């Protein structure tokens, strides 16, 4: 995760960098197809976001390594990019809590929602079922790079907080917190995928 990767850089290196190497070696030996879960942080802030944090850098570097393995060893692969996944069973506590789950938990406990400044950071929140459907489709039909899986609707973090109808407190800015990310879903949509869920409706159900 982006902000936490500064503190847990050793974990980022072990899980992201060493992890993908092990997976690629497995794919090379077995002939399996790899569907790699890249990160939309690669497209943050007009392309500058890929170096904004240890997390973003390792995920972006991994996509290049996957492509190189395709060229060097002829492995079969497709690279997907997730955009701010939300849904059931998210982590709601601790430093790895996801935004929607964290806000939901705070509202239930009548606590203040905290938003990292400036609050105008935009995100394309995408429901987990839409993500899974995209992965399956790309796994069956996709080849190569560039399969973004993300909702076309984008909202600022402050807009999301206001949907919960609670008290809001602004926090100082943090390292690696990108403002935007380019949505690259054209290749995935060409396979027949589209986002079918709406974050506003999901939040309304959560707080009702």
What label would you give each PLM region?
Residues 1-85:
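N-terminal Rossmann-like NAD(P)+-binding domain of SDR-like oxidoreductases, especially those catalyzing
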Residues 7, 15-18, 52-53, 57, ...:
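Residue-level signal for the nucleotide or nucleotide-sugar donor/cofactor binding architecture
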Residues 23, 66, 103, 187-189:
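Structural element of the ATP-grasp superfamily
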Residues 46, 88-91, 158, 187:
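Short beta-loop-alpha junction of Rossmann-like oxidoreductase domains
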Residues 54-56, 67-123, 128-139, 162-165:
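NAD(P)-dependent short-chain dehydrogenase/reductase
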Residues 107-208:
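C-terminal substrate-binding subdomain of Rossmann-fold SDR/epimerase-dehydratase oxidoreductases
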